[in-house]
């Protein structure tokens, strides 16, 4: 299966939420997301539009300008997105690094770990389709999972030989979702550094940078701000553990799909339905039950945020 950070994190939080957001059948495909109301500016839509504007900006700085993306039909969203990118350009009129790549989508095959012991040191090649784990006597297929995502900016610090990568995160003014303590513990830095090593080999990969864009206040009385970029390093052991954990999650998702499918309600983590600072996107139907009215008025088919058509699969 193909798995990204968002899907893995949602499954960790609640398998039933993962099913609703990634696998629930719709006429357009798989998965549901909340439907914006009127001119509401959703965090997901604003983040997507901001990524388009940042892609234009960094390609401009790189010297390879691209055709501008169409403006959003949501006037409130477009106004806020333009306000943020204008302030961002003023904050960073130039960068002190060489831009190598912008908005790079990727598909990297995850390691073949035995689904019983999650080790790879005693694998025996049986044929081009399967391995035998001599530790536990278990046969399993090769290449069962692929890690997918998009690296926002790949760059080389001036005078340095290694490549660093940067990820942009847009959040509300008072949010603490991207504070340094959270990023110090997150797996994304480890996983992206692992993927970058495969994508850009034989280049040496250095550090992961978090670039937070804080939205203006709700009534626009305070402008957007951009905290100092966070710089994260990871040890080989941290990277190896994060990759192993992702393989484990992907195996669990496949196991749940086999056991529960579309006919039986998936297990859920009810402790996370209401976290104290917000509710799960599917709190209403999971608490009071699905109805046609809730489905039509509250949800829409999920829009894919990764365009992976034609993106080659890379072996690490």
Positions of predicted regions on the chain:
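Catalytic cores of nuclease domains that cleave nucleic-acid phosphodiester backbones
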Residues: 53-175, 198-207, 316
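Nuclease catalytic cores
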Residues: 2-59, 103-104, 275, 279-285
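Active-site-adjacent bridging/hinge elements
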Residues: 19-29, 162-169, 250-255
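Residue-level detector of short, conserved catalytic/binding motifs and their immediate flanks
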Residues: 151, 190, 278
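Metal-dependent nuclease catalytic regions and adjoining charged, substrate-binding loops involved
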Residues: 116-117, 125-127, 143, 181-182, ...
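Short amphipathic alpha-helical face segments that pack within enzyme cores
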Residues: 49, 187-195
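Short alpha-helix boundary/capping segments
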Residues: 41-45, 177-187
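Short small-residue beta-strand/loop micro-motif enriched in glycine and branched aliphatics
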Residues: 29-32, 173-177
């Amino acid at each position: 299966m193909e798995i990204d950070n968002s899907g893995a994190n949602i499954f960790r939080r609640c398998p039933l939420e993962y099913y609703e957001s990634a696998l629930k059948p719709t006429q357009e495909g798989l998965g549901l997301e909340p439907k914006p109301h009127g001119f509401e500016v959703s965090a997901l839509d604003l983040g997507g539009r901001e990524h388009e504007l940042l892609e234009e900006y960094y390609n401009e700085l790189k010297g390879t300008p691209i055709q501008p993306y169409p403006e959003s039909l949501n006037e409130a969203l477009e106004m806020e997105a333009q306000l943020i990118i204008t302030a961002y350009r003023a904050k960073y009129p130039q960068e002190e690094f060489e831009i190598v790549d912008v908005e790079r989508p990727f598909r990297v095959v995850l390691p073949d770990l035995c689904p019983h012991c999650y080790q790879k040191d005693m694998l025996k090649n049986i044929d081009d389709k399967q391995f035998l784990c001599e530790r536990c006597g278990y046969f399993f297929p090769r290449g069962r999972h692929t890690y997918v995502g998009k690296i926002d900016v790949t760059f080389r610090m001036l005078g340095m030989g290694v490549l660093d990568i940067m990820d942009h995160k847009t959040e509300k003014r008072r949010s603490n979702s991207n504070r340094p303590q959270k990023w110090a513990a997150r797996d994304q830095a480890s996983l992206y550094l692992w993927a970058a090593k495969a994508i850009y080999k034989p280049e040496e990969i250095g550090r992961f940078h978090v670039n937070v864009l804080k939205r203006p206040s709700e009534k626009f009385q305070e402008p957007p701000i951009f905290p100092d970029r966070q710089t994260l390093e990871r040890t080989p052991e941290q990277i190896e553990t994060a990759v192993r954990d992702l393989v484990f999650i992907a195996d669990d998702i496949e196991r749940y799909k086999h056991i529960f499918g579309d006919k039986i309600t998936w297990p859920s983590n009810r402790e996370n339905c209401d976290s104290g600072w917000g509710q799960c996107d599917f709190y209403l139907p999971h608490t009071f039950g699905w109805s046609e009215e809730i489905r039509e008025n509250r949800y829409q088919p999920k829009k894919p945020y990764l365009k992976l058509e034609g993106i080659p699969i890379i072996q690490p």
